[in-house]
Regions:
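Short secondary-structure transition/capping segments
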Residues: 41-45, 142-143, 160
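Alpha-helix C-terminal capping/helix-coil junction sites
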Residues: 23, 140-141
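Short secondary-structure capping/turn micro-motifs that flank functional sites
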Residues: 36-39, 137, 155-156
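Conserved small/polar residues in nucleotide/adenosyl-binding loops
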Residues: 163-167
């Protein structure tokens, strides 16, 4: 099976060729693996990556409200049983502040615009550097991330590493 899969170098080459072709046809990359013509970006995806609360309705749906994750059952019988008791979901899990920070970072770094240091402070009451300073510095030294003004984001090499690492 492995001989059927492209090498990591070939994956990066295909990724960069795809990006070049899409750019030539007017598509912009707004997330590490999503392209759209300006104004046609997925609002759902951008909301998810921006850590905006959302409500999922129906079988196997998930929601994120008030820093909690909610999940509906994937089995129809279980779903109908829960609904008959007046419950709207199977389980809820509150995220710790650290888990919220982690999600803010890894979801936000998927966007080509990256993440705002100011927004991190407003959301969590501490600086991004105080929590992730060592990792940020090391990633920047390795050329995987960069900082411009208030924003931190992945470089092209950082995107390729993330894209090829099954992250």
């Amino acid at each position: 099976v492995e001989e059927l899969l492209p090498s990591e170098e070939d994956e990066v080459l295909m990724y960069r060729m795809t990006e070049k072709i899409l750019n030539e046809y007017g598509y912009d990359k707004y997330e590490i693996s999503n392209y759209a013509k300006p104004g046609f970006e997925s609002r759902h995806n951008l909301g998810y990556w921006s850590h905006i609360p959302y409500l999922g309705v129906g079988l196997n749906a998930s929601s994120y409200l008030d820093e909690k994750r909610f999940e509906n059952p994937s089995d129809m019988k279980d779903y109908l049983e829960i609904q008959s008791f007046g419950d709207a979901y199977e389980g809820a899990r509150s995220l710790s502040v650290y888990e919220q920070m982690e999600e803010f970072m890894f979801l936000g770094l998927r966007k080509t615009k990256g993440i705002s240091k100011k927004e991190f402070i407003e959301r969590f009451g501490c600086s991004m550097d105080s929590v992730y300073g060592k990792q940020l510095i090391e990633s920047m030294k390795q050329g995987m991330m960069k900082e411009e003004g208030d924003r931190v984001f992945l470089t092209q090499d950082g995107i390729c590493l993330l894209y090829t690492s099954d992250a």
